[in-house]
């Protein structure tokens, strides 16, 4: 009997003890200090759970690696501006297709809504500065007025690549797209109210940087004010503003660097005989074929070689020869006299369309003939102009007339004591600056300047030579062409192999033998 009473008391004690454990919240601890994360009783330092980077709208993941950048064919132009060199490109994202007319018209629609020219005639300059130059279709001895009038506006051309856009306009579009995507994410997550966008006018509009700095006050959504809001203040109450540390917003869209664009164009992952497809499975460190063109089949030719109804068809939209932009009636070879749909032709190994032909594309880099030799061998890029947030006398940031946070160049005085760079503007570093022997007298001895930007890829009006991703040309950043469009890219945060992958090799730990 006594034993029975003892067992009852013991069971009761266990139950009471477990009830106490159930009500006690477990916290992650800092491996550096031992303090709890996200615990209001221990300082309230908020640390989000590790998150994988989501793939932004329109993008595909490009796993980085090493490749030989530069010419793959004889330099028939005699430019000697694409000397082969091995470089490494970090993983990144790039648009699956070129930016289409319908995408760019969405940008113009937003500008018209926020910067209403009827309410303020001064806003007309903002709209005009963003509009594509449709007059690029004109030629002295060709009838192209239908393209001037309708190519950008008519719904028949919705999914055709936008042209007549300068490098500066493409750069501004990338900034706008970054802000709209992040604003959309916050609305979908319930942290920003959709009703709030109705009151946006002039500089009072959402940009990612102004929101993060608190210069733009968004109207909180239902998710932000809910008790289920996972974001907390140090005191443990729901937090209405999102920070970059929360892992919800994406990095900025931007123009791809030349090395990124060229690497993505080849799609070399398709030339790996056994690529790694999941964590723990090692792939071959091998590229089986050196490609001339982006497509995966017949990598050195221009036609489909596999049997079937498409046997012999062109693999890109380009100009076969003088006076031949499409072939003969009843058997058109590329089925496009001018541009074609941004999703036409085969995608390459990374799933990217039209990296050769259709339209050539702007990349971020400033042009120099010998950039291949001068630039770093990891993430090479020429065009750095280091910036910082502009602050007024009180030390506060401010926004400009477009709602963007004002930025200013890092001065040479600020850079002089640094080991890794000594000037703020290094566009002409080792090629046009005082340290080099090169002299660029723009308009006198050369057409190369610090505003010359690279474009790549060949177009509907180019011969096959320009379809090789290794070829490169340049144009001033404020000029446009009927043969040049663009696509956007985005930095990759996290494992270079993609989501659900680790960074670095993890070996099974073994005890040392004594």
Can you describe what each PLM-predicted range is?
Residues 1-5:
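Positively charged n-region of N-terminal signal peptides that target proteins for export
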Residues 6-13:
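Sec-dependent N-terminal signal peptides
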Residues 17-18:
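C-terminal motif of bacterial Sec signal peptides marking the signal peptidase cleavage site
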Residues 25-39, 61-62, 68, 73, ...:
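Functional-site microenvironments in short loops/helix caps that host divalent-cation chemistry
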Residues 39-50:
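Basic K/R-rich, polyanion-interacting modules in nucleoproteins and related proteins
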Residues 47-49, 79-82, 472-477:
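Short, P/G- and charge-enriched loop/turn segments at secondary-structure junctions
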Residues 51-147, 158-181, 357, 485, ...:
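A short glycine-rich, aromatic-capped structural motif
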Residues 471-474, 484, 490-491, 504-506:
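Catalytic loop of the DD-peptidase/beta-lactamase superfamily, centered on the K-T-G motif
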């Amino acid at each position: 009997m006594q034993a029975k009473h003892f067992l009852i008391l013991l069971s009761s004690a266990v139950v009471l003890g477990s009830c106490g454990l159930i009500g006690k919240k477990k916290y992650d601890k800092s491996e550096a200090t031992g303090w709890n994360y996200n615990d209001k009783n221990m300082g309230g330092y908020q640390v989000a759970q590790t998150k994988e980077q989501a793939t932004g709208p329109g993008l595909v993941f490009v796993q980085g690696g090493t490749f030989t950048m530069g010419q793959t064919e004889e330099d028939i132009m005699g430019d000697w501006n694409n000397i082969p060199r091995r470089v490494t490109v970090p993983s990144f994202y790039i648009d699956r297709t070129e930016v289409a007319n319908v995408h760019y018209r969405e940008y113009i629609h937003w500008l018209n809504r926020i910067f209403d020219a009827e309410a303020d005639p001064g806003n007309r300059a903002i709209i005009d500065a963003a509009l594509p130059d449709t007059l690029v279709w004109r030629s002295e001895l060709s009838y192209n007025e239908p393209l001037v009038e309708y190519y950008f506006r008519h719904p028949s051309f919705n999914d055709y690549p936008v042209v007549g856009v300068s490098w500066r306009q493409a750069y501004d579009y990338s900034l706008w797209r970054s802000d709209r995507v992040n604003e959309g994410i916050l609305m979908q997550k319930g942290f920003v109210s959709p009703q709030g966008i109705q009151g946006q006018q002039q500089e009072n509009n959402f940009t990612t940087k102004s929101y993060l700095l608190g210069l733009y006050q968004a109207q909180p959504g239902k998710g932000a004010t809910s008790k289920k809001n996972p974001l907390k203040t140090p005191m443990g109450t729901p937090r209405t503003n999102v920070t970059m540390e929360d892992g919800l917003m994406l990095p900025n869209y931007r123009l791809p660097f030349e090395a990124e664009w060229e690497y993505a164009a080849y799609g070399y992952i398709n030339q790996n005989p056994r690529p790694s497809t999941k964590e723990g499975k090692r792939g071959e460190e091998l590229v089986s074929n050196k490609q001339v063109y982006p497509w995966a089949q017949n990598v050195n030719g221009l036609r489909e070689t596999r049997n079937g109804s498409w046997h012999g068809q062109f693999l890109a939209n380009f100009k076969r020869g003088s006076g031949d932009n499409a072939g003969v009636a009843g058997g058109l070879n590329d089925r496009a006299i001018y541009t074609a749909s941004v999703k036409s032709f085969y995608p390459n190994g990374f799933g990217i369309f039209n990296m050769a032909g259709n339209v050539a594309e702007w990349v971020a880099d400033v042009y120099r003939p010998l950039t291949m030799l001068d630039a770093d061998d990891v993430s090479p890029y020429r065009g750095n102009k280091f910036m910082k947030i502009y602050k007024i006398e009180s030390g506060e940031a401010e926004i400009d007339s477009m709602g963007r946070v004002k930025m200013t160049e890092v001065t040479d005085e600020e850079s002089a004591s640094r080991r890794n760079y000594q000037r703020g503007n290094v566009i002409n570093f080792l090629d046009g600056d005082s340290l080099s022997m090169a002299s660029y007298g723009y308009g006198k001895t050369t057409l190369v300047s610090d505003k010359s930007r690279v474009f790549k890829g060949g177009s509907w009006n180019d011969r096959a030579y320009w379809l090789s991703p290794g070829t490169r040309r340049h144009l001033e950043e404020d000029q446009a062409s009927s043969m040049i469009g663009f696509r956007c890219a985005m930095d990759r945060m996290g494992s270079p192999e993609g989501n659900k992958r680790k960074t670095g090799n993890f070996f099974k730990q073994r005890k040392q033998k004594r």
